[in-house]
Curated annotation (Swiss-Prot):
GO terms for molecular function: mRNA 5'-cap (guanine-N7-)-methyltransferase activity; RNA binding. It comes from Aspergillus clavatus (strain ATCC 1007 / CBS 513.65 / DSM 816 / NCTC 3887 / NRRL 1 / QM 1276 / 107). MRNA binds at N203, N204. Keywords: Methyltransferase, mRNA capping, mRNA processing, Nucleus, RNA-binding, S-adenosyl-L-methionine, Transferase. It comes from the Eukaryota. Coiled coil: none annotated. Residues 48-76, 141-152, 408-420 have a biased composition (Basic and acidic residues). The lineage of its organism: Eukaryota, Fungi, Dikarya, Ascomycota, Pezizomycotina. It is an enzyme of class 2 (transferase). Residues 1-10 have a biased composition (Polar residues). This is mRNA cap guanine-N(7) methyltransferase. Residues 1-152, 407-430 are annotated as: Disordered.
């Protein structure tokens, strides 16, 4: 039997080998003290027990179990010595799934014991083809060629669009700079010193005739011309009954302000627009002079309210001008608008005028359509579009005539030089056409159609010169039939078209316009003769006038 101390710790017996090896710990005789000298026997037992506990703390017995923490530390140390990383707390979560061996279903050992027929593998189990980088872009030569052609077409379209935009800005800037540079001359100079005073007066009379005949609305004209059309036989309407709202595209220096003040149906609002900023300033100054009473010359109608703004009327939308927005402009005018808008919609203006200006819009189809969209958008139903522009019939006749003469001359030269070889460096004959006289000149820089039909109808540029007025400014042919067909897309119906000299023949004896021509210095009061030279008549015949109705 083992002897136990008071603390319950087992103690080896006297005959065990441990007792022989450590006599100081187990033998009572090794540290025995005589009784009665240093305390009682209980004190001796307590002292021996405390010494045994101290020795047990310093050296644990070999058979005492090791703690779990210490075992883990020793294990980690061994793994580090072998070059392996000990597992972390996340080793189970992050451990990769063990690869599942590819089982051969044909092997009888791997075959399922189910009596049901074997099911085909699901799409997820089928092997997937690997996609190589850029594999979708690899295609045949035909597809690559198609893509290349499309890319080239897109790039070419972008370049052409950029060129058209830059060229459009260039022509507009040239025209703007030219009219900004034209000096302001007074009325006295135009009547006495001008070389083309007869042509100036005649052109002003033509514009006055157009305003007198076509600016009033149908109701006003019916009451003015024939009171019997009305049940009450009231005669001409009073001036305050209905007044006109007018917008002038290309108003210049305001030379037509007086003509609009003399309109049969009084004007309530006049909006003048022009791309030349200097011209707008001068037009505003002329209007302020008329408003203050200077140069009014006793006109019967009160002066209308006038608004002026610089604007490219053919290359830009007019809807961002404040006064135009207030009066009203239809953004749906034209072929892209809705059916209801074209039938019931419209702007708020009674008249849109454009004198000697619309030929600048025929640089391109885009500009021509933008011009007509502005016109149709401003006009109310029944409104009028008045204007004058170069006569394409005159231009075509001249082109056919000059091309025929050039062709005959070339054939004659070929017959004369049929045996002669062309010399080195010989330049081909210039194909440009030119005609005019001392006061005006028209010149086409390149080839022109021999039959006089301009196809396509846009972009046929020529240079025009007019003494004291226009200095070699680029203009564009307005092929009339193409223009008339284009206006139908904007609900504009042609009502009137006449060359300048034809208007004179029709209206010179009118009871109102005849005396007006005498007051304006167009006709001699005594002889009735037209006060223009033959060269001025030729220059005047280059133009014609027109009027469209908004339907």
């Amino acid at each position: 039997m083992e002897n136990r101390s008071s603390s319950g710790t087992p103690r080896p017996s006297a005959g065990s080998p441990d007792a022989a090896k450590r006599p100081s710990e187990t033998s009572p005789a090794a540290g025995r003290i005589p009784a009665g000298q240093n305390g009682s026997s209980g004190d001796k037992k307590r002292k021996v027990t405390e010494e045994g506990e101290a020795s047990e703390k310093s050296e644990p017995p070999a058979d005492r179990p090791m703690s779990k923490r210490k075992r883990m530390e020793e294990r980690h140390q061994k793994l580090r010595k072998r070059g392996r990383t000990p597992p972390s707390a996340y080793s189970r979560r992050d451990a990769e799934a063990a690869p599942v061996p590819n089982r051969n279903r044909d092997d009888p050992a791997n075959r399922s014991l189910s009596p049901l027929p074997h099911r085909s593998p699901t799409p997820e189990e089928q092997p997937r083809q690997r996609k190589r980088p850029g594999g979708g872009a690899r295609m045949g030569l035909v597809d690559r060629e198609t893509l290349r052609r499309r890319q080239e077409e897109r790039e070419r379209a972008l370049v052409e669009e950029a060129m058209r935009t830059s060229q459009g800005r260039g022509v507009t800037d040239v025209v703007r700079q030219h009219y900004n540079a034209v000096p302001q001359r007074g009325r006295e100079w135009r009547k006495t010193e001008s070389k083309i005073k007869g042509l100036r007066s005649f052109n002003n009379w033509i514009k006055s005739t157009l305003i007198q005949k076509f600016s009033p609305d149908e109701e006003f004209l019916a009451r003015l011309n024939d009171g019997r059309d009305w049940a009450d036989d009231s005669g001409p309407p009073p001036a305050e009954e209905k007044r006109l709202l007018v917008v002038d595209l290309g108003c210049g220096k305001g030379g037509d302000l007086g003509k609009w003040q003399l309109a049969p149906q009084p004007v309530e609002l006049y909006v003048g627009l022009d791309p030349a900023e200097v011209s707008i300033v001068q037009a505003r100054e002329r209007y302020n002079s008329m408003k203050s009473g200077r140069g009014n010359r006793g006109r019967r109608n009160p002066l209308f309210h006038g608004e002026f703004a610089p604007k490219d009327c053919f290359g830009e939308w007019l809807g961002d001008i404040g006064i135009v927005q207030q009066v009203g402009i239809d953004p749906n005018a034209g072929p892209g608008g809705s059916v209801m808008s074209s039938r019931w919609g419209g702007g708020g203006f009674d008249v849109v005028a454009s004198m000697f200006a619309i030929h600048y819009a025929f640089e391109s189809e885009e500009k021509a359509r933008q011009m007509l969209r502005n016109v149709a958008g401003c006009l109310k139903k029944g409104g009028r579009f008045l204007g004058v522009c170069p006569n394409s019939d005159i231009i075509s006749a001249r082109v056919v005539e000059l091309n025929a003469k050039r062709k005959a001359r070339e054939e004659q030269e070929k017959k004369e030089k049929s045996d002669e070889a062309p010399e080195d460096g010989e330049v081909e004959e210039d194909t440009k056409l030119e005609w005019g006289n001392s006061i005006y000149r028209v010149q086409f820089p390149g080839k022109t159609p021999e039959d006089g039909i301009f196809r396509p109808p846009f972009g046929w540029k020529y240079s025009y010169f007019m003494e004291e007025a226009v200095e070699e400014v680029p203009e564009y042919v307005v092929p009339w039939e193409a223009f008339r067909a284009l206006t139908e897309d904007y609900n504009l119906e042609l009502q009137y078209r006449k060359p300048f000299l034809g208007i004179w023949g029709d209206e010179k004896d009118d009871r109102e316009l005849g005396p007006l021509s005498e007051r304006m210095g167009v006709r001699d009061r005594n002889t009735g003769e037209l006060l223009m030279t033959e060269e001025e008549k030729e220059a005047a015949n280059f133009y014609h006038a027109f009027c469209f109705y908004k339907v």
